[in-house]
Amino acid sequence: MKVEIYTDGACKGNPGPGGWGVLLRYNGREKTLHGGEAQTTNNRMELMAAIKGLEALKRPCEVDLYTDSQYLQQGMKEWIKTWKRNGWRNSKKELVKNAELWKSLDNLASIHNIHWHWVKGHSGHLENDLVDALANLGIEELS
């Protein structure tokens, strides 16, 4: 099955209250997801959005995943292979930040054939604007 996933994370303060939003599109249908955490960072919320989107898939899929986070897109397309090879350490020999989320995302990604796409945030991209609103709703619902 072919699926489009749009993801976004948001944070009020960094760290601070954060939220994530997801839009899944498949077979002419759409499903939205969102949530939040009281104390987090924007990067953690970007990762959580991708994790939650992939967790929603019931079987292996052909996925086009769209994000406005270069951290997420480059992490999955470029950096993760080196991190794994180096025992989850970066080029400075420091432990990779958010390693537990990267590991979870890597495990989920291994189930699917994923094409990672970067889109410019806050630029009138309809789906990106929607998941941004969902991420902010995740923050609002914390209070």
UniProtKB/Swiss-Prot annotation:
EC numbers listed for it are 3.1.26.4
Alphabetical keyword list? Cytoplasm, Endonuclease, Hydrolase, Magnesium, Metal-binding, Nuclease
What does it catalyze? Endonucleolytic cleavage to 5'-phosphomonoester
| EC top class, as a word | hydrolase
Q: Which cofactor does it need?
A: Mg(2+)
Per the record, the major location class is cytoplasm
> Which cellular components does GO assign to this protein?
cytoplasm
Where, in this chain's numbering, is Mg(2+) 2 bound?
A: 8, 132
Indicate which residues the UniProt annotation says bind Mg(2+) 1: 8, 46, 68
Q: Where in the cell is it found?
A: Cytoplasm
Q: Name one GO molecular function term.
A: RNA-DNA hybrid ribonuclease activity
Q: Which GO terms describe its biological process?
A: DNA replication, removal of RNA primer
Q: For the RNase H type-1 domain, which residue ranges apply? A: 1-140
One of this protein's Pfam families, by short name?
Answer: RNase_H
Comment on bound cofactor: Binds 1 Mg(2+) ion per subunit. May bind a second metal ion at a regulatory site, or after substrate binding.
Q: Which family does it belong to?
A: Belongs to the RNase H family.
Q: What does this protein do?
A: Endonuclease that specifically degrades the RNA of RNA-DNA hybrids.
Subunit structure, interactors included: Monomer.
Q: Quote the protein name from its UniProt record.
A: Ribonuclease H
At the highest ranks, the source species' classification is: Bacteria, Pseudomonadati, Pseudomonadota, Gammaproteobacteria, Legionellales
